[in-house]
Design a protein with these regions (language model features):
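Conserved glycine-rich cofactor-binding loop
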Residues: 15, 22-24
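Substrate-binding pocket helix/loop in short-chain dehydrogenase/reductase
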Residues: 104-106, 113-115
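C-terminal helical subdomain
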Residues: 189, 205-248
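Conserved glycine-rich Rossmann-like NAD(P)H-binding loop of the short-chain dehydrogenase/reductase
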Residues: 36-52
C-alpha cells in the first residue's frame, strides 16, 4: 500500500540521497521523491546532467536539491559524499549506481578495472550503508534502498564480476533488513532484470539477446514507484512484469 505523502516525508525525509541519479531508474527515483516533498541529494559522475535534473526538480516541486559530482568507484567516494552532505538529515539512502561497463569474459578485462567495479558495487555500498544507516538508527527511522540486479541470483558468462558483486549487495541488504527491521529502519533490495533504458538495451545487445532494441521492457518510472511503495515490505522486491530475459546459452 502507498504511504501518504505526509507520512512518507516524516518517515524518510527530509533529505534523500540518490547515488546514481543522472538518468534511468535513478532519475525516476529523484522525480518521485521530489513529488512526495523530499529534498534530494543527486549523486553521479555527470554534473551537467545532474544540474539539469536539479533545475527541473526545484522548479516543478519547490524542493531543495544538492548536486554531488562524484565517481562512486573511487576509494574515497563515500568520504567525499559524506562531506558534501554535511549536517543534512538524510532519511533515505538509495544506491542505484553499479552497472557493468565491460561485459567481457573475466580475463579480457584487467584486474585493475575489475577492482574499480568491486569498489563501485561493494566497498562504496558498504561504506555508505554503514554511515547513513548508523544515523538513521540513531533517529529510529529511515530507509535504505539498494538497487540491484537479478544477475545476483546466479553466474552469467561475460558478467562474472558483475554477478558476484551484485550478489554481495543482495546479501548485505537482506542481512541489514534482518538487523534493522525492528529498529525503525526499512531496507529493501530492488532486483532489476530488465528496464527500458538505453544503458540496459545496449547491455542486452552486447549479450547477443534477440530483439534487444525492440522488446517491451518495464519503465524506469514504474520500477521506482513500486519500490518506494514497497519500501517497508523488505527484504527483496522484483517487479511482477520484470522477468529477466532468458540467456541460458550465456550460462554455459
Amino acid at each position: 500500500m502507498s504511504v501518504p505523502d505526509n507520512a512518507f516525508q516524516h518517515r524518510y525525509g527530509p533529505w534523500a540521497v540518490i547515488a546514481g541519479a543522472s538518468h534511468g531508474v535513478g532519475a525516476a527515483f529523484a522525480r518521485s521523491l521530489a513529488e512526495r516533498g523530499l529534498n534530494c541529494v543527486l549523486v553521479a559522475r555527470r554534473g551537467d546532467t545532474l544540474a539539469q535534473l536539479k533545475s527541473e526538480l526545484e522548479q516543478q516541486y519547490a524542493i531543495d536539491v544538492l548536486v554531488v559530482t562524484q565517481d562512486l568507484s573511487h576509494p574515497d567516494a563515500c568520504e567525499r559524499l559524506l562531506a558534501a552532505v554535511g549536517e543534512r538529515p538524510v532519511g533515505l539512502f538509495i544506491y542505484n549506481a553499479g552497472g557493468d561497463p565491460y561485459i567481457t569474459r573475466f580475463l579480457d578485462t584487467s584486474a585493475e578495472d575489475w577492482g574499480a567495479l568491486l569498489r563501485l558495487n561493494c566497498l562504496t555500498v558498504m561504506q555508505c550503508s554503514h554511515a547513513f544507516g548508523a544515523a538513521m538508527l540513531e533517529r529510529g527511522q529511515g530507509g535504505l534502498l539498494l538497487v540491484g540486479s537479478q544477475a545476483a541470483l546466479g553466474g552469467i558468462r561475460k558478467l562474472a564480476m558483475y554477478t558476484a558483486t551484485k550478489g554481495f549487495a543482495l546479501n548485505l541488504g537482506e542481512s541489514l533488513w534482518a538487523e534493522w527491521k525492528d529498529r525503525g529502519v526499512d531496507v529493501l533490495n530492488l532486483l532489476i532484470g530488465t528496464v527500458d533504458t538505453p544503458t540496459m538495451r545496449n547491455a542486452m545487445v552486447k549479450l547477443n539477446i534477440a530483439d534487444a532494441l525492440t522488446m517491451t521492457l518495464p519503465k524506469a518510472e514504474d520500477l521506482a514507484l513500486l519500490a518506494l511503495e514497497e519500501l517497508g515490505n523488505g527484504p527483496t522486491l522484483i517487479h511482477p512484469e520484470d522477468t529477466l530475459v532468458q540467456v541460458a546459452n550465456a550460462r554455459g
